[in-house]
Each structure stands twice: as structure tokens, then as C-alpha cells.
């Protein structure tokens, strides 16, 4: 009998894209709040959700640098358990409750893709990069801030 939490199944279950839960996560995150055309935001909503009339197209874009683990084996295969993710959240209403709906998520790791699919997230494979700086200054280290605040 073939085994595994996700596909591909194998005799010992080791070929699966992701191990079974529970999964534990840690990340760095950058979020950008923005307002878009309310009709464009409404076009992403599935049946059962309505636009939030108070939000006027409010949305959030998040960029995450994740590490996750299931059976404490991330140190054996760090590439399997580290990934980047970018997602969009738009304001909506479910019945009379304000919620945020996630129409798009991009990840750069197939294990993260499979974990998301098992929980109903609309993940797709993509490439996600963030500008970063380094402690050692130089032309390749992007400045964190160009100018100090003058008071």
C-alpha cells in the first residue's frame, strides 16, 4: 500500500511533498496597506462574500520569509522547510462580519504549496524577492534609510 500525507505517495511515505501536521511556523513579514479600485477588489470575492462598504477598496499585500517544521526535521532538509510567500488580502463582509479574503498567494516551494492546498489556500508557485540590507555597508547593501529625521 502506498503511503504519504500528500502526493506523490510511496511505499514508505517519504516521497510526499509535505509531512503530516501539526506544522509550526516562524517568519519575518513586511506588510503594505493600500487602497485599490473598489470594483477591482469586489471582482476577487467568491460567492458568499460581499464587498465591505466601509473599506473603499482596502487591501493588504504581505511578503513573508518563512520557516516551518512538522516532525522537527527542518535541520536535516532546510530547503524543504524554508520558503518565501507573497499574498494579498482584501476587505469583505461575511454575513454582517468584516473579514479579509485572500484571493492570491504565491510561494517558491512545493512543500509550502502542498501545505496550503490541504487547508484550502489558493497557492501558486512564484518567485518572491525583497530588497534587503546587510550590516557590512557597501554599494551592494541597500540603505535602510537614506536620511535621518531632522527635528
Q: Where are each of the predicted segments found?
A:
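A generic structural signal for solvent-exposed, polar alpha-helical segments
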Residues: 11, 18, 29, 89, ...
Amino acid at each position: 500500500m502506498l503511503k504519504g500525507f500528500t502526493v506523490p505517495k510511496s511505499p514508505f511515505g517519504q516521497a510526499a511533498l509535505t509531512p503530516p501536521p501539526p506544522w509550526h511556523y516562524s517568519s519575518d513579514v513586511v506588510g503594505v496597506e493600500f487602497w485599490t479600485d473598489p470594483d477591482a477588489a469586489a471582482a476577487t470575492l467568491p460567492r458568499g462574500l460581499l464587498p465591505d462598504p466601509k473599506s473603499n477598496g482596502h487591501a493588504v499585500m504581505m511578503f513573508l520569509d518563512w520557516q516551518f517544521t512538522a516532525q522537527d526535521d527542518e535541520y536535516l532538509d532546510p530547503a524543504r522547510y524554508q520558503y518565501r510567500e507573497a499574498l494579498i488580502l482584501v476587505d469583505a463582509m461575511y454575513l454582517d462580519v468584516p473579514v479579509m479574503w485572500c484571493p492570491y498567494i504565491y510561494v517558491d516551494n512545493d512543500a509550502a504549496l502542498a501545505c496550503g492546498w490541504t487547508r484550502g489556500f489558493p497557492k501558486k508557485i512564484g518567485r518572491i524577492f525583497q530588497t534587503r540590507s546587510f550590516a557590512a555597508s557597501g554599494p551592494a547593501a541597500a540603505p535602510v534609510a537614506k536620511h535621518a529625521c531632522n527635528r
